[in-house]
């Protein structure tokens, strides 16, 4: 373990792109991770890996995924890739082990339960690297949409629907919500005074 592994407050942010949403049928085609400190400052970006799949697999995706992954360039990156699921998992775990010990960070991101389900089936070693808890920005978004619509509408994602851009968006989105959390936002959280 590297010298820069410290404390339990670092956060591992992750996103996956998949061929679809069915964990029994679909597959991970891209993975990216970022490690931040507790104040959401980026400490390191992990490898952004397209995972090799056949043209037949990509063509079997639904129309939304085919169009999106062609537009983002992921389609071609997947076809050109030689990286297997096992290699992507090993490279990601190796990166994370340089920054945070296993079990210390919740899995962080948007709609992260879906990512966790795919990891459990296809990259179980990586899934076990996380604490069992999740830091799901989607939960905060859903609460804000219902309880503070102006706060929710104040953030617009800029994502290209690639794993790394989605991870960056998740971090930026939590930074946005944090400024409205008062004392829950921490030292750098700011907050709205009534």
Curated annotation (Swiss-Prot):
Keyword Nuclease: yes
Record key words, sorted: Cytoplasm, Exonuclease, Hydrolase, Nuclease
E.C. numbers: 3.1.15.-
Domain Exonuclease as annotated: residue spans: 11-174
Gene3D superfamilies listed in its UniProt record: Ribonuclease H-like superfamily/Ribonuclease H
Residues of the active site: 132
Subcellular location field: Cytoplasm
SMART domains membership: EXOIII
InterPro entries associated with the record: Exonuclease_RNaseT/DNA_pol3, Oligoribonuclease, RNaseH-like_sf, RNaseH_sf
EC class of the enzyme, as a word: hydrolase
One GO term describing the cellular component: cytoplasm
Role, per record: 3'-to-5' exoribonuclease specific for small oligoribonucleotides.
NCBIfam families registered for this protein in UniProt: PRK05359.1
Xref: PANTHER family: OLIGORIBONUCLEASE, MITOCHONDRIAL
Protein name, as recorded: Oligoribonuclease
Species annotation: Xanthomonas campestris pv. campestris (strain ATCC 33913 / DSM 3586 / NCPPB 528 / LMG 568 / P 25)
């Amino acid at each position: 373990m590297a010298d820069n592994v410290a404390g339990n407050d670092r956060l591992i942010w992750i996103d996956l792109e998949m061929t679809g949403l069915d964990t029994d049928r679909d597959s991970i085609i891209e993975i990216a991770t970022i490690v931040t400190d507790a104040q959401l400052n980026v400490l390191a970006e992990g490898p952004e890996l397209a995972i090799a799949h056949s043209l037949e697999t990509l063509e079997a995706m639904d129309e939304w995924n085919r169009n999106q992954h062609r537009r983002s360039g992921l389609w071609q990156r997947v076809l050109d890739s030689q990286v297997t699921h096992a290699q992507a998992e090993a490279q990601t775990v190796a990166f994370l082990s340089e920054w945070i010990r296993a079990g210390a960070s919740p899995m962080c991101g948007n709609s992260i339960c879906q990512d966790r389900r795919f990891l459990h089936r296809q990259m179980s070693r990586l899934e076990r690297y996380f604490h069992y808890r999740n830091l799901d920005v989607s939960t905060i978004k859903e609460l804000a949409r219902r309880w503070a619509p102006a706060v929710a509408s104040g953030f617009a994602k800029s994502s290209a629907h690639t794993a790394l851009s989605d991870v960056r968006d998740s971090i930026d989105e939590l930074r946005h919500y944090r400024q409205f959390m008062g004392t829950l936002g921490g030292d750098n959280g700011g907050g709205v005074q009534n």
